[in-house]
Amino acid sequence: MTYLLALDQGTSSSRSIVFDREGRIVAIAQKELTQIYPRPGWVEHDPMEIWHSQLATARDVLAKAKLQPADIHAIGITNQRETTLLWNRKTGQPVHHAIVWQDRRAEPMCAQLRDQGMAATIQEKTGLVIDAYFSGTKLRWLLDNVPGARAQAERGELAFGTVDSWLMWQLTGGKVHVTDVSNASRTMLFNVHRNEWDADLLKALDIPAALMPSVQPSSSHFADTDAALLGRALPIGGVAGDQQSALFGQACFAAGMAKNTYGTGCFLLMHTGGECQPSHNGLLVTSAAQTSATPQYAMEGSVFVGGAVVQWLRDGLKAIKGSAEVQSLAESVPDAGGVMMVPAFTGLGAPYWDADARGTITGLTRGTTVAHIARAALESIAYQSAALLQAMSRDAVAAGGTPVAELRVDGGASVNDLLMQFQADLLGIPVVRPEVIETTALGAAYLAGLSTGVYSDARQLSKLWKVERRFMPTMGRAQAEESMARWERAVRQATAT
């Protein structure tokens, strides 16, 4: 039997999943990751905790699956994107905590870049908007604020990487400093047209080129692991940022196919094939997972606070004791009772891109209960995703394509039937949940399997993808449009300054 090991390093946890060659889950191991909040708007992770937790889950999952290292054909890696690490090449020690994608400390630097007229150049070269979300300004902050970092970087003593690079450095005992195109495309330093680091952007952000990892296609041989770590040297055959990996795991291989991952944030991606189509509706252009040197692209919309709104209900508002309660509480009322929540706790992402927006709850009356607020919180995830898909469809039509015909879904919150049905109602298209919702890890496994001969091509992978449930719209379009209009009014209140 052939098995593939996916290392899935996420924002809230490190996980490892073993899949068989049919894409079925054999075993899962998980360890929570400590969230560090030094100041309001700052979010960090301990790089050594990232590494040790990921290695521990890899060992745990082999034990759970009752497999030997020799049973694993290849390893695939998928990871939280944009999170920025800087470490010493000689010692392998990080010079600072990892700055997480949610972190907003680099916003003043982004404002300077906008004032310098860099917005159009950065969007044209990278497909991204100037935002503290991406790695480039986080890296610049580290160079400017960690004592001695800039001098060390200019001497070639430091290495920059996103989480995938950091894990591969550790997995190989410091032998490789590499990333894949999908992760590189999220740095605001990578030219998505030329598939290489952009010298002009590195210069504009005052980042030494010696810091940067080499870049490979997502499905390729990156390295072999140090045999001492897992009992045998195993090939790392696939690497992709979590959202591009999920797009691949959802078998969205053709232009116009789209998926939404409902995790800490929500991430909606539509494959655009070999065309690097610009967005005119506030969306990002990004590199999709590549299986060869030929570029592939996707359009992306990012929601900063998706499932995290449920965590806030539990930990911040103390409205629920556990995340599992939210569906039953929300279902105890027929609707949100006029309550609308905009969870802009860290600003708003696409298609609004307002770093100064703050969370609001509107429509409160004496009759409002905690159940109405819970339902409004859940519905806010669907509203944000619907705004993204509508923007995406407008871009697709403008480029001569057609609106998205169905939305494939995955991630932890996709198991919530109430949320999925409301999503279908707002969109007016089927929302399709696959049998395996661990599509982020599955995508990494597929990429590794492709490069090592387990699979022959994307056609074979498409046949493995199976539907668990299809949610059909039941709400009339007039009602859905009125609901979206109410959402946009609430957003305007959240973004008012």
Swiss-Prot record:
Q: Superkingdom of the source? A: Bacteria
Which CDD domains does the annotation name? Answer: FGGY_EcGK_like (cd07786)
At which positions is sn-glycerol 3-phosphate bound? 11, 81-82, 133, 242
**Example GO biological process term?**
glycerol catabolic process
UniProt entry tagged with the keyword NAD:
no
Catalytic reaction list:
glycerol + ATP = sn-glycerol 3-phosphate + ADP + H(+)
Q: Give the protein's function.
A: Key enzyme in the regulation of glycerol uptake and metabolism. Catalyzes the phosphorylation of glycerol to yield sn-glycerol 3-phosphate.
**Top class in the EC scheme:** transferase
Q: Which GO terms describe its cellular component?
A: cytosol
Instruction: Name the InterPro entries for this protein.
Output: ATPase_NBD (IPR043129), Carb_kinase_FGGY (IPR000577), Carb_kinase_FGGY_CS (IPR018483), FGGY_C (IPR018485), FGGY_N (IPR018484), Glycerol_kin (IPR005999)
The cross-references to HAMAP family, in alphabetical order and at most eight, read: Glycerol_kin
UniProt-listed PROSITE patterns: FGGY_KINASES_1 (PS00933), FGGY_KINASES_2 (PS00445)
What GO molecular function terms would the record report? ATP binding; glycerol kinase activity
Q: Which family does it belong to?
A: Belongs to the FGGY kinase family.
Sites binding ADP sit at: 11, 15, 264, 307, 412, 416
Which pathway, metabolic or otherwise, does it act in?
Polyol metabolism; glycerol degradation via glycerol kinase pathway; sn-glycerol 3-phosphate from glycerol: step 1/1
Keywords, comma-separated and alphabetical: ATP-binding, Glycerol metabolism, Kinase, Nucleotide-binding, Transferase
Transmembrane residue ranges: none
Pfam families, alphabetized: FGGY_C, FGGY_N
Tell me the Gene3D superfamilies matching this sequence: 3.30.420.40
Binding positions (glycerol): 81-82, 133, 242-243
What name goes with this protein?
Answer: Glycerol kinase
Q: What is its EC number?
A: 2.7.1.30
